[in-house]
Amino acid sequence: ENIYETEEFLTKKGIESSSAKMVKKGTLLIAMYGATAGVLAVSHIDAAINQAILALIPNIDINLFYLKSTIANQIDVAVHRLVQGGQPNFNASIINAFELRLPTLPEQKAIADVLSAADEEISLLQKGLEEEKLKKKSLMQLLLTGLVRVNE
C-alpha cells in the first residue's frame, strides 16, 4: 500500500485538540488493531495519524520498500501467533522485537526491486481474476434468467 492522498483532513486546531500526530512523507505506517491490523503503507505525503497507527521512522539509511517488505514478512509470522479466535492486535513492543536482516543498500534495492515486480504481477493477476469473476456473474445472469439459452 502507498498513500498519496487522504479522504479526510484535520485543521491545525483539530490536530492540537486530538491525539493525532503528524508524520512526514516517507514514513512507514502500520495499522495496529482492528480489521486492518498488520496492514502496512508508505506515506508519500505529510499526514496526520491516530493512535491506531504506528509510524516507523528509520534512523539508518535503508531502502524503504525493503524495510516494508521485511516488516510485512515479520507481521505475517506474528499474526499466526497472535490470532486466538479473533483479530490480532499489535503494539510497538511487538514490532520493536522484530529482528531485521540488513544487507548492503545495493542488495536491499535489488531485493526490493524483485519483490516490487512480484507485487505488480500479483496485482495484475488479481485484476484479471476480478474481471473474470464479473464475466461469470454476467453470464450467470443471462443464463439463469433465461435471456440466453443453452442448446442441449
Task: Tell where the protein language model's regions lie, with residue ranges.
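A generic structural signal for residues embedded in beta-strands
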Residues: 30-31, 117
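Basic, amphipathic alpha-helical recognition segments used for DNA target recognition
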Residues: 2-5, 25, 42-46, 51-102
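Sequence-specific dsDNA recognition surfaces
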Residues: 1-25
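Amphipathic alpha-helical coiled-coil/heptad-repeat segments
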Residues: 99-152
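Conserved catalytic core of Hanks-type protein kinase domains
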Residues: 32, 70, 142
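Short, charged beta-turn/beta-strand-edge "cap" motif at the junction between a beta-strand
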Residues: 35-38
